[in-house]
Amino acid sequence: MSFDEIAPDAKKVAIYGKGGIGKSTTTQNTAAALAYFFDKKVMIHGCDPKADSTRMILHGKPQDTVMDVLREEGEEAVTLEKVRKIGFKDILCVESGGPEPGVGCAGRGVITAVDMMRELEGYPDDLDNLFFDVLGDVVCGGFAMPLRDGLAQEIYIVTSGEMMALYAANNIAKGILKYAEQSGVRLGGIICNARNVDGEKELMDEFCDKLGTKLIHYVPRDNIVQKAEFNKMTVIEFDPECNQAKEYRTLAKNIDENDELVKPTPMTMDELEELVVKYGLIDL
């Protein structure tokens, strides 16, 4: 399997990040910006068991996940009409879903869902942008599928100037490096979803430098993101003229035009610790 086998002309991107970092919010607003401002044909495939990767694009409508339909109705019931929905600006939306709590492996669900979508030819040939929104706390076999099997050409990691977010980002970089030769996958850059901690921009610049990549965009914190989510919309749909919409527009443009893809140089735990101590995140 290579990334040329699905949606051959699309820019195929996987967005990784630890749970709660704002990865799905970032993915949906980026996808919405590409569709709204640049008239791109976009699809999001959510690879997070929370199945919230497309919620705002679909205005909060419940999404039948591939794994839910498979478990409850059987393989024959998994059709594009049932599991692939159309949202804001005709963005196509699919959620892998996961197992029942306490039973089975969510990573395995990602593998199954992607395989079924390929069989159903669920990734249209005329896509401009295809996003995989992937849980990044653990880069296990299933969640590493976009890396390992070359589903995505380039990976972007959402992080912030906080210890555990940086730890997860560094681990994801290790996963990218592991599969770089096998699948051709590369790191496109780091997206900082700002938490407004002291020295955050400087910390992110140095973190990117250590990984051998670049800060693709520093997304400032803004309460309009929560207001839009409360109204079950992306910021782009809620208020396309606001400052935060312009930030997401810039992020979308930076990703779409980026061709500086690298094999990352992950830090050792000692190096990461030194970095966060330098910026006062932890005391030793």
UniProtKB/Swiss-Prot annotation:
Alphabetized UniProt keyword annotations: 4Fe-4S, ADP-ribosylation, ATP-binding, Iron, Iron-sulfur, Metal-binding, Nitrogen fixation, Nucleotide-binding, Oxidoreductase
Entry EC number(s): 1.18.6.1
PROSITE patterns tied to this protein: NIFH_FRXC_1 (PS00746), NIFH_FRXC_2 (PS00692), NIFH_FRXC_3 (PS51026)
Record family assignment: Belongs to the NifH/BchL/ChlL family.
Post-translational modifications: The reversible ADP-ribosylation of Arg-108 inactivates the nitrogenase reductase and regulates nitrogenase activity.
Gene encoding the protein: nifH1
Record's catalysed reaction(s): N2 + 8 reduced [2Fe-2S]-[ferredoxin] + 16 ATP + 16 H2O = H2 + 8 oxidized [2Fe-2S]-[ferredoxin] + 2 NH4(+) + 16 ADP + 16 phosphate + 6 H(+)
UniProt-annotated binding residues for [4Fe-4S] cluster: 105, 140
Cofactor-binding details, from the entry: Binds 1 [4Fe-4S] cluster per dimer.
EC class (word): oxidoreductase
SUPFAM superfamilies membership: P-loop containing nucleoside triphosphate hydrolases
Protein name: Nitrogenase iron protein 1
NCBIfam families linked: nifH (TIGR01287)
Cofactors, names only: [4Fe-4S] cluster
Subunit structure: Homodimer.
GO molecular function term, any single one: metal ion binding
